[in-house]
């Protein structure tokens, strides 16, 4: 189960936010919060709606999750659903933290999209990797991710996948799966201005799913 981590003391995101099922205390459908916080909920849901329109199916639900206090995951994809840690269900805090990460190069720019849209797009990238895996018959997301990034690298001038991932973001170098998630977030947020390496990864994804 993968997810983004956060260092709340530093006010920014960092990698290593993977969680286990035992970290999840409860979840609820995010749409249930729309009556009370429509604008922010819609920001979070927009990438999900967009991806569903483009690919047909991405995830069953977008959820808010209550996690154990020692969990630093901001959001995660569990193989069926995408969830946002309710601790980070705060627009201002999310925007401030994400801006710091973009400035440092840890995550790609979110362009004209909001931080919430960028974070959820990242998790959708994991879901799309999973969808490709089902097409390939590969049972593990890391195995699917390796196939995807190796195909994408051939569309670039890079000699290795880490070198390619480094052009996307620092976090993209942590694993092939994170490189894909960062690439989708980059392309979703920046369109034609996204990094060429991100576009190469999405070309491969789209080749399998469209």
Model-derived features: positions:
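Long, low-complexity, intrinsically disordered regions
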Residues: 1-4, 8-10
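Active-site-flanking segments in enzyme catalytic domains
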Residues: 12-49, 54-210
């Amino acid at each position: 189960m993968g997810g983004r981590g956060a260092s709340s003391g530093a006010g920014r995101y960092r990698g290593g936010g993977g969680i286990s099922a035992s970290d999840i205390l409860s979840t609820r459908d995010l749409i249930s919060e729309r009556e009370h916080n429509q604008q922010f909920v819609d920001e979070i849901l927009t990438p999900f709606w967009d991806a569903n329109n483009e690919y047909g199916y991405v995830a069953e639900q977008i959820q808010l999750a209550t996690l154990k206090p020692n969990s630093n995951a901001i959001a995660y994809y569990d193989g069926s659903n995408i969830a946002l840690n309710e601790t980070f269900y705060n627009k201002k805090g999310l925007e401030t933290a994400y801006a710091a990460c973009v400035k440092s190069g840890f995550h790609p720019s979110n362009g004209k999209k909001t931080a919430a849209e960028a974070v959820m797009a990242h998790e959708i990238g994991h879901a799309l990797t999973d969808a490709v895996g089902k097409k390939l018959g590969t049972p593990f997301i890391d195995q699917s991710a390796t196939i995807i990034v190796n195909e994408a690298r051939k569309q670039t001038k890079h000699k290795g996948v880490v070198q390619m991932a480094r052009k996307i973001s620092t976090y993209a170098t942590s694993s092939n799966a994170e490189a894909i998630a960062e690439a989708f977030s980059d392309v979703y947020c920046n369109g034609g201005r996204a990094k060429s390496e991100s576009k190469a990864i999405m070309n491969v994804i789209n080749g399998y799913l469209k």
